[in-house]
């Protein structure tokens, strides 16, 4: 091989993509020879650095990670009010505080909590995979957002240890480095950070005879326990409910992240409003929203963007986002970015022509009133089911005035008819999941019709066997939908004329077992969900939707939903969402200019 007047040494690494190229005159570039030899200590302390050369300064990590402050070809301009100084004074991720909360909820004074982080995933028959997403329970007590980790918490010794992978040089070359132990400790208040291969060794002192090991799921039992056999106890039942309960009340650090996610997402909603008259297809709205979030340091969405125009708005989780906006009255934009794994969840209903049609305005004002009145009642001690019942009452009053419903208000509420227009719960918790866990109680309803895995409420139990042990674990779903008879039970409670109510429901062809379950639900105050408490973050998202079988006149309206993220405070609430709505939204849509 000839290279003009120079001579080089070439070393292949993993096919042809990585070479060490050294000139005899001393100029070098590529992978330094020291990184071709496995040196775990060196890898822990350093990352690949480009050798000095005429163009290496242009490729420095600091340059590549600097956020743009001027417009690029997409037309997105970074808002100086959303600069990164929001993290100043935030401190370390409170992993230790979270671990202690879990131990308290667990009610254990000894034992080991063991959690596995997420590994890299690949699509079937492919060397490509989805974007990495850390397991949320693991992140809660570590703050570590990279693959291949584990964590142990010794409850008796109050010692929290993060276990991280060693990375081979060629992996660093292709995918970059992972944080070093020192960097992990600087970012999170874990006690120690070690390499995970030490955890795999039999002489590792973490797991001892006589201990109870708490795991989330039976399939996450560490293989390191094989040599201990029956000398340890495995509990795969209690940890998940304990962690769910701990996650319900957010720490100040968590609230700061949710507030930041709301700030970026609200600004992205405003950017869409200011450009609404320029769009011709739902996909353009989707693209602008996500692009704005990326430009402001929130590249991951909490859930797929819902840009549903016209009749698409009646599909709650519509995400095709590919329909023309021509002749569409309304757009529901349900979108929120996450920041450091913490979610936001924001919905706005936007008039596509720039102003509401008379029919659409009527429905929008009704939903706006439902939300305003419910938010105003939020404070500690209020049961969330009472807020939902109030939203239903406001909806029925409004629908009666519009002539959409006919009859007596009390009778309509008693029958649960409003569920045909407002079929989902008023809200849910927000945190590490957009539909976050709610602890041992559901936010709105506990039990009742449809309880169990994959349904709208309650618990289910799964069981597995490990080395002869029968391991039970509790499964809880998060998203709540409401049937007419559940709404009726929620509204009426237990009434003396129970048999008369049962007769009305049976005449409407409701199955007897579901009627009896709804009546049991109505008679139990403990089944009516959670009372709000300081530190909870919940959505308030009333909606009115129209289907052909309900009312053809409002079919083109599709649906209206307005959603904000609300922090429950000691004396009331704080609305974390600042995206314009109502009259402020209409004013924003009249503003001119780019983003």
UniProtKB/Swiss-Prot annotation:
Catalytic reaction(s) noted: Release of any N-terminal amino acid, including proline, that is linked to proline, even from a dipeptide or tripeptide
GO molecular function annotation: manganese ion binding; metalloaminopeptidase activity
Keyword Protease recorded: yes
Chain sites annotated for binding Mn(2+) 2: 334, 345, 563
One of the Pfam families matching this protein, by short name: AMP_N
GO terms of biological process kind: proteolysis
The keyword Hydrolase belongs to this UniProt entry's keyword annotation: yes
Keywords tagged on the record: Aminopeptidase, Hydrolase, Manganese, Metal-binding, Metalloprotease, Protease
Chain sites annotated for binding Mn(2+) 1: 345, 541, 563
Low complexity bias spans: 52-66
UniProt cofactor note: Binds 2 manganese ions per subunit.
EC number from the UniProt entry: 3.4.11.9
Region listing for Disordered, in residue ranges: 51-76
Obligatory cofactor(s): Mn(2+)
Similarity comment text for this entry: Belongs to the peptidase M24B family.
Functional description taken from the UniProt entry: Catalyzes the removal of a penultimate prolyl residue from the N-termini of peptides.
Protein name: Probable Xaa-Pro aminopeptidase CHGG_02942
Gene source species: Chaetomium globosum (strain ATCC 6205 / CBS 148.51 / DSM 1962 / NBRC 6347 / NRRL 1970) (Soil fungus)
Taxonomic lineage from the root: Eukaryota, Fungi, Dikarya, Ascomycota, Pezizomycotina
